Structure formats: structure tokens, C-alpha cells
């Protein structure tokens, strides 16, 4: 009897030892799993940080920043840019004129107390879809795209502003106010307000317009569009039209 009791006790002890060993192994594996997971998470965080840092350093003035979502009252879109020069005449590129006018307009609007975002602040390329998406993410009140015109015969002249029939009804009002205000400032030929279903007008979710500030292919207008004082007049006209628009929707 004593021998059998000893055998049972011995067997029980061996079973307990195996169970303890399994528990220790399980705890060890859980511990190692936690360590490995922590290392992977830390690596991902560090890797992500350097990716964002590299992007920010290589795009210091590119406001198409997917890591910012602060709201803006107004989006100004400087047409073309980077590999897309837009219209070109006598080595003068549309992308340079539109950027200069956009920056001048931005300063005027900010001085009037509005929060303004711009699709580009330097010579960078942005797709049309990116421009529209940026404006939508910013939840802006209005979107104004600034361009220069061209014609094959070089005779085209004047300023015109477009809105889309698929955009909000108030886009027409915005287009008319901006068009009239620019004409008042510049005394340029009034080509009036027209409809056009451009990508940036159709895919934006706020009243949106596109301003053609003059013809680069027209020698006289090309000279004017390259002049800093004339650009200021256009910028003032765009600003005046926007301010009048906001006055009308406040009434």
C-alpha cells in the first residue's frame, strides 16, 4: 500500500511539474510576443515619423499637405505649375503669372481678415483632382482658380470668369461679382461670365469659379500680365469681388 501511494504521489508530482513547465513556456512565449509586437510598433512609428519629416522637408511650401486638415474660408488655386507651364508665349509661362497673382490676392484677403489657403506657393505640379480634393478637405466656403488665356491667332483679349452649371447656384453670383470687380480695376475688355464644366469647378463641393485674367498670346495683354502693378489690380479685383460675395450671403 505504501508503495502504491508513493507511485501515485510521484506520478502527481510529475504531472504538476509538466503543467508548471507548460505554464512557464506559455508565459515566456507571451512575454516574447509582447516584446516583438512592441518592437514592431516602435519601428512603424519611427519609420512613419521619418517619412512625414522627409515629405515636409521636401515640400516646405506645398499646401497640398495630407497631414493638415484645418479649415479655410477661401481656397485660391494658382493654375498649372511644375511640369505643366500652361500657356507659354515669348518665354513667359502662365504658371508664373497665376502664382504671382494668387499670392497677391492671398495677402489682400488675409489683410481683410479671411483665412486663405492656396494650392501651391511655389512652382510645383498638382493634378486637377488633387486641387479639388484639397479644397474639399479644407471645407472652404469658396474656391477661386486663377489662370491666363491663349488663342491661336494671338488676337484674343479680355478677361472672363467661368462657373459650372453643376456647381452651387451661388457660384454664378460669385463669378459675376469677381468678373465685374476685375473689369472695374483693370478696364480690360469684358468677356463676361460663362459656364464651363472644368474639373476643378465640377468636383469641388463649394461655390467655385475659374478666372481667365487675360491672353498671354496677345502682345499687349502679355505685357500687362507681366507687370507687377497690373497684377495688383487683378488681385484687387478678385479680392473686391470675393468681399462683395461674402457681404451678399451675410444679408
Walk through the language-model features, giving the residues of each.
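Catalytic-site microenvironment of enzymes
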Residues: 1-251
Amino acid at each position: 500500500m505504501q508503495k502504491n501511494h508513493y507511485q501515485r504521489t510521484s506520478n502527481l508530482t510529475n504531472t504538476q511539474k509538466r503543467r508548471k513547465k507548460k505554464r512557464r513556456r506559455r508565459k515566456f512565449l507571451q512575454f516574447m510576443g509582447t516584446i516583438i509586437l512592441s518592437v514592431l510598433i516602435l519601428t512603424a512609428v519611427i519609420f512613419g515619423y521619418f517619412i512625414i519629416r522627409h515629405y515636409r522637408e521636401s515640400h516646405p511650401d506645398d499646401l497640398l499637405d495630407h497631414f493638415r486638415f484645418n479649415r479655410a474660408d477661401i481656397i485660391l488655386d494658382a493654375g498649372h505649375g511644375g511640369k505643366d507651364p500652361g500657356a507659354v508665349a515669348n518665354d513667359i509661362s502662365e504658371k508664373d503669372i497665376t502664382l504671382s497673382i494668387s499670392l497677391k490676392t492671398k495677402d489682400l484677403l488675409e489683410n481683410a481678415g479671411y483665412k486663405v489657403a492656396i494650392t501651391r506657393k511655389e512652382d510645383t505640379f498638382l493634378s486637377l483632382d488633387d486641387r479639388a480634393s484639397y479644397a474639399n478637405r479644407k471645407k472652404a466656403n469658396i474656391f477661386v482658380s486663377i489662370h491666363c488665356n491663349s488663342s491661336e491667332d494671338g488676337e484674343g483679349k479680355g478677361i472672363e470668369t467661368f462657373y459650372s452649371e453643376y456647381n452651387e447656384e451661388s457660384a454664378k453670383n460669385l463669378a459675376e461679382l469677381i468678373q465685374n470687380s476685375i473689369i472695374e480695376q483693370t478696364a480690360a475688355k469684358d468677356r463676361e461670365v460663362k459656364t464651363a464644366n472644368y474639373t476643378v469647378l465640377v468636383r469641388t463641393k463649394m461655390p467655385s469659379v475659374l478666372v481667365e485674367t487675360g491672353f498671354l498670346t496677345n502682345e499687349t495683354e502679355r505685357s500687362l500680365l507681366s507687370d507687377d502693378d497690373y497684377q495688383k489690380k487683378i488681385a484687387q479685383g478678385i479680392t473686391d469681388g470675393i468681399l462683395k460675395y461674402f457681404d451678399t450671403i451675410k444679408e
